[in-house]
Amino acid sequence: MLTEAQVVALEKAKTEKEAHGEFESEHHPGYCGAQDTFYVGNLKRVGRVYQQTFIDTDAKLACTKLYDRKTPITAADLLNDRVIPFYESHDVKLLRILTDRGSEYCGNPERHEYELYLAVEDIDHSRTKTKSPQTNGICERFHKTVLNEFYRIAFRKKVYRSIDEL
């Protein structure tokens, strides 16, 4: 039996979880995807390169795409170009996306391109707590692996002149 203080503490914790977009994870592909932006580097003759990353948190499927800027349009483009078509080809509905609170993901829902795209596709948007990158740890770990296993090796072997070449 719970005391009154314990019930109040549980209700407060539940309210706090909802306020920060935390949720109990179901276990099926499409229930939740994590999306993040990774700064690859500044390449000569190319400029800044950013990688948009999407990972299905259950299936561990990753989709990435490189861009020369980090904007709401590029964040939505990854979903529109790679993620949603993949899920549709397998008759799976993407239900929720977890992102950080970066400007490419968060803004006025009536004018922000990424927020508008999620609304059109009927995808719920959860956000991590401020200054808590570990909340989206699946993307953080993936970025570290890609950096060590691909980018550092690729950049030692060749000079890339375009994002498409990379």
Question: Can you say where each PLM-predicted feature lies in the sequence?
Answer:
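Mobile-element integrase/transposase regions
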Residues: 1-55, 61, 77, 81
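C-terminal domain-tail junction helix/linker
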Residues: 2-25, 29, 119-123, 144-166
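Buried hydrophobic side chains on well-structured beta-strands
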Residues: 60, 97-100
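Short small-residue beta-strand/loop micro-motif enriched in glycine and branched aliphatics
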Residues: 61-65, 126-128, 152-154
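Active-site beta-loop-alpha junctions of metal-dependent nucleic acid enzymes
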Residues: 65-92
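Hydrophobic beta-strand scaffold residues
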Residues: 94, 124-125
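RNase H-like two-metal-ion nuclease catalytic core shared by retroviral integrases
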Residues: 99-101, 105, 111-118, 125-149, ...
